Each structure stands twice: as structure tokens, then as C-alpha cells.
Amino acid sequence: MSVKTYRRGVILICAALCGALTASLNIWSIFQKPLMEAYGFSPQSVSFAYTIVIAMIGLSGPIGGWLQRKAPAHIIMTVAGIGFGLGWFLTGFASTIPVLYISFGLLVGVCDGICYNLALAIATRWYPDKRGFANGVALAIMAIYPLFTAPMGNMIIENFNVSIAFNIVGVFCIVGFIVLSRFLKMPAADFKPEGWNPPAESDTKRVKNYTSGQMLKTPFFWTLLLFFGTVACTGCVMLSTVSLVGQVQAGMDAATGALMVGIFAIANGRGRLGLGAISDKLGRFQTMFVAVAVTA
């Protein structure tokens, strides 16, 4: 294995692990019921905090893309990662709804969008020859993260309280981002893996680059926005409520609810990794069509 191959493999894993830290959001469902019981919050008010997070992730994604052109990747990831962990930590002191919305909804949401966007960008740019594979590996690692953290989070809540659980998640994320970010960097603009050559010009001559303004004027952009928004919302609803629904409607205890989050993570991870690799062979749109058809 060449040094260059080894290095991009390390960067891929570190970027994926940074993305996995943002997947702490996927264990939100184990916090909802304890949070309501601790402070008397209504289910609607607690659920709206997650809605704010998702909105902020969508709005901050373009900011992350802009920052990638202005500062080194490891600096952006470190700063945004610390902000992400700080949001979780401060949520441990959120005894009122406004504080919950600011610390968790706004701070965690904005920093999550920046970190998530950057993690995937780093992963795929180091693998121009296997973009689907790199994207699949990164997303799979992010997806299986709750398999380990959901039971641990539930154990902390049961042995201490929900506030301390938020504090611990926050500190863990801050330390994780600081350590992992040190290994991140973007490849040079002309980077290409050893033994791989970009497609001939004749194969890519129909590709056209758009500015942000031009992109917003195309019907294709709005079609994709509606499509991806619908798919993402479906997944987010499942992720944010799987434990709570199991406890409230199926009578599960907290430990079983956390186990459900883990099972969901396994299925999610296998799908992301497999479909990412398949898309390199079958094509992006064809794979997407099959995946959505099966899900529906």
C-alpha cells in the first residue's frame, strides 16, 4: 500500500468519525422522555427543538461550503466541532424551553450542518475514483454510531440524570473533534490517486458548472430540493422518535428503546455502505430511484 493511499484512507476514516460525532443527534429520542419528566416540558415543545436543529442544519450547510474556500479544513472542523459539543453541554442546563431552543436547536444545529457538510466533502474529494464508495463508508460510520452511543447514553441517564448525560455527550464531542480534526485536510485541486486518470474530455463535455445564482434559477434544483427534503424529513422523523414511540406506544422500557435505536443504526449503516458502492457501478440516479422505490 502506497503512502498516498494510506494517507487518504486515514483522512477518510477521520472525516467519517467527525461526521459520526454529529450523528449524536440520532440518539435524541432517548433524551426526550427523561427531559420531559425532569422539567415538565410538553412533547410538542421538546420535539420542536429537534425541528429547529434540522432547519439549522439545512441553512448552515451552504455556510460550511463557503467556509471551505476561506479556511483550512481542520480549523473549520475544530471550531464548529467545539461549538457543536458546547451546544450539547449547555443543553444540560436547559431548564427552560427558550434555553433549550438556543443551546440545542440553534447552536447544535448550525455547527452540525457545517461539520457534516465538511466531513462528506473531505471524504469524497480524496476519492475522485470511488466517490460513491467513500461517501458510503463515511455515511455508514455515521449511521452505526448510535448503535454504541444509544445504550451508553441510556445507561448514563438511568444512573445519573439527563442533564449529566447532555454534559458528557458535549465533552466527548469536543474532545473528539479536537483530536480528529488534526488529521483533516483537503486534497490539492489537481489531486488524482495513483494509477487513476479522470474520464476523457469527450465523456464529460456535457457537464456545466453553475454559480449559486444560476443554480437557483433552474427547475432541476428545486425538484432535487423537494425530493431530498422529503426523503430527509422521513428519515429524521424516524430517527428522532424511534425510542420515544417504542416506550409510549409499545410499552418498552428505556433500555429496549435504546436497543431499537441501535437496530435502526445497523440497518441504516448497511444501506448507506451498500448503496454507496452500488452507485459507483449502477449510477447515482438509478441507485437513488431503486432505493426510494423500495423504501416507499
Task: Map each language-model feature to its residues.
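Extracytoplasmic gate region of multi-pass secondary transporters
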Residues: 28-35, 210-277
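Residue-level signature of mid-helix packing/kink "hotspots" within the transmembrane helices
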Residues: 26, 54-62, 146-147, 265-273
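Hydrophobic core of transmembrane alpha-helices in multi-pass small-molecule transporters
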Residues: 20, 87, 98-114, 229
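Conserved MFS/SLC helix-loop-helix module at the cytosolic interface between two early adjacent transmembrane helices
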Residues: 59-98, 279-285
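Extracytoplasmic
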Residues: 10-43, 60-64, 149-150, 230-231, ...
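Flexible cytoplasmic inter-helical loops of multi-pass small-molecule transporters
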Residues: 186-209
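Intracellular juxtamembrane helix-capping segments at the cytosolic ends
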Residues: 35, 105, 113-127, 134-135, ...
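Helix-loop-helix hairpin linking two adjacent transmembrane segments in secondary transporters
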Residues: 137-191
